[in-house]
Amino acid sequence: MSTSNDPSNNASAGKCPFHAETPKQSAGSGTANRDWWPNQLRVDLLNQHSNRSNPLGENFNYREEFKKLDYSALKADLRALLTDSQEWWPADWGSYIGLFIRMAWHGAGTYRTVDGRGGAGRGQQRFAPLNSWPDNVSLDKARRLLWPVKQKYGQKISWADLYMLAGNVALENAGFRTFGFGAGREDVWEPDLDVDWGDEKEWLAHRHPESLAKQAIGATEMGLIYVNPEGPNASGEPLSAAAAIRATFGNMAMDDEEIVALIAGGHTLGKTHGAAETSHVGAEPEAAPLEAQGLGWHSSYGSGAGADAITSGLEVVWTQTPTQWSNYFFENLFKYEWVQTRSPAGAIQFEAKDAPEIIPDPFNPEKKRKPTMLVTDLTLRFDPEFEKISRRFLNDPQAFNEAFARAWFKLTHRDMGPKSRYLGPEVPKEDLIWQDPLPAATHQPSAEDIASLKTAIAGAGLSVSELVSVAWASASTFRGGDKRGGANGARLALAPQKDWPVNAIASRVLPTLQAIQRASGKASLADIIVLAGVVGVEQAAAAAGVSVNVPFTPGRVDALPEQTDVESFDLLQPLADGFRNYRRIEGGVSTETLLIDKAQQLTLTAPEMTVLVGGLRVLGANYDGSKHGVFTDRVGVLSNDFFVNLLDMATVWKAADDNAELFTGSDRKTGEAKYSATRVDLVFGSNSVLRALAEVYACADGQQKLVHDFVAAWTKVMNLDRFDL
């Protein structure tokens, strides 16, 4: 036996020999599963933002905490901060107005209407990758400047709200009258993993504008919020930038007037920074050394800040009063002819030809400059349609002010969902069509009314499949990213949702439910649709031998056609809904990946997704009434048959088409065909994580658990848009 004085013993006394060398491994290091299997299904996307990452705990209620906020005092502190120039990051012209406007804009500007992801609603700018995007250089300083204010007010104001409010206060401090402000953005505590920022592996990799119209990605280059300010791929051509500008702003549902107003308004205040070549700039925050404490882009040029600051590499000041609102942007745009030049960093920009030096230097009051513009600023003059709007704003400053106020409000609130989510004393009274407005409630059904309605629905001759399917069709449009969609409003009865192929059930079932609604007069159609699902689930559970009361809370209302923007709502039409075995377009992303995408939009966990798919299959809820995945001979019974039969080794599966979208399950011994299935169905037996979940419900003791878990997940989906609960 080895002892401590044994010369053959290499480890010192009392120490483990395995710890004698410098550690080379740690938790999470080494080759990961996705390195081996890059196409592995991202079930982990359904585990984001759980209570395990939230330091505030599950009982924290931001809406209640916000009520304790001294809103006026907070705004006063923000106003004071704007002119409290710090030595470590001096303010241009003694004011952080431009910096805070840019911070708010870049926080909100990542939103895209196609999938509802991105935007300012969760304070993601403080996390990677956004905190380190090339377009967000120096915004780490803006957020750090806000820290004393955040520290003072604590959880009464979220970071997400503070970023946006700081931008609003900056505009007000510049003399601009904003449209209003709604708080209500709740922080999360880790980066969003579900947002597709693109496949590029290099920062500022160029994308063609035509490709932007075919995907959800908002920017023309990886790491930009919108477009390259030097023109497409730094071409220096103002006119060619128009298509890229329309494509990127169009992904936020901004029209030409809103585009012109936003660009001009954002560039009425502040400046860009390009004191020297960007080679002086160090690593972004995520790659910066530990001692940088979350700050990045340390510059070796001069002081690295103030007059020596390098951000975009462009050195542009647009107006004569960069800390005061004016119409100088348009006046300068049309008053001068512009010649292409380069910034001290070598970036392409334009300077006013033969103009006097009328632009104040940000740090030396004795110095003046000529007016300068970005390549994309000149697009507003040389694109024919943009030029018409720009000239109108030139001649009518009040029209410009009104347009910018509304466009800025839309930009900073577009991902917040309905107006009912807004908090604070500055919420505008006017309802805007992009907020998906709803009328005031006119029905308050009592418990007795609800019982009578359930009886009427149960006696209407509708099957369990029909009852469940119509409720799912109504509620499952919800998107957790921008809080749009859902059952409230009964927009399933309106264009465009009633005409979607996936909602074919609506034309068959809604007339019956509408007749019940008219006869009763006690509840909205929206409530009756959800109540139909309640009746269907309760009947299906009872048929399985489990008695349940599915929770139901009335209070939904019915939207009017004039409150429904058809084009905007058509973006909610699913590419696929694996819960109903529906896929609209073949090819591209795998069907099972689209199931994960849909489940994530519905804010479901992996167990919730699993039990809902299995339950909906045996209830016969496929959109077209097909038998794919209906692994049961007792359709309409909320059984665990889907899981039992899927995991039965007596069945062997083979692809039934060339694309491996459909499969046939046959008896392993006889070869007799038993079932048909889609990729969504089989993934619960194929994927190791989902199979582990499926096994829970396939066990002998899984039936009752399945019913109760299904009811809980079902109720969650039905109430996703009930922000009043």
Swiss-Prot record:
Q: Where is this site: Transition state stabilizer?
A: R102
**Co-factor: note:** Binds 1 heme b (iron(II)-protoporphyrin IX) group per dimer.
Q: Which UniProt keywords apply?
A: Heme, Hydrogen peroxide, Iron, Metal-binding, Oxidoreductase, Peroxidase, Signal
Give any Pfam family that matches: peroxidase
The UniProt regions of compositional bias labelled Polar residues, in chain numbering, are 1-12, 23-32
Residue(s) of cross-link: Tryptophyl-tyrosyl-methioninium (Tyr-Met) (with W-105): Y226-M252
Q: Where is this cross-link: Tryptophyl-tyrosyl-methioninium (Trp-Tyr) (with M-252)?
A: W105-Y226
Question: What CDD domains has UniProt attached to this entry?
Answer: catalase_peroxidase_2
Question: From its record, what is one biological process in GO terms?
Answer: cellular response to hydrogen peroxide
Q: Which reaction does it catalyse?
A: H2O2 + AH2 = A + 2 H2O; 2 H2O2 = O2 + 2 H2O
Which SUPFAM superfamilies does this UniProt record tie to the protein? Heme-dependent peroxidases (SSF48113)
* An example Gene Ontology molecular-function term: catalase activity
**PTM:** Formation of the three residue Trp-Tyr-Met cross-link is important for the catalase, but not the peroxidase activity of the enzyme.
Q: Which GO terms describe its cellular component?
A: cytosol
What's its top-level EC category? oxidoreductase
- Catalytic residues? H106 (proton acceptor)
Q: Please list every transmembrane segment annotated in the UniProt record, as residue ranges.
A: none
Q: Which cofactor does it need?
A: heme b
Binding-site positions, heme b:
H267
Quaternary structure note: Homodimer or homotetramer.
Q: What family does this chain come from, according to its entry?
A: Belongs to the peroxidase family. Peroxidase/catalase subfamily.
State its role. Answer: Bifunctional enzyme with both catalase and broad-spectrum peroxidase activity.
Protein name per Swiss-Prot or TrEMBL = Catalase-peroxidase
Q: Which organism is it from?
A: Klebsiella pneumoniae subsp. pneumoniae (strain ATCC 700721 / MGH 78578)
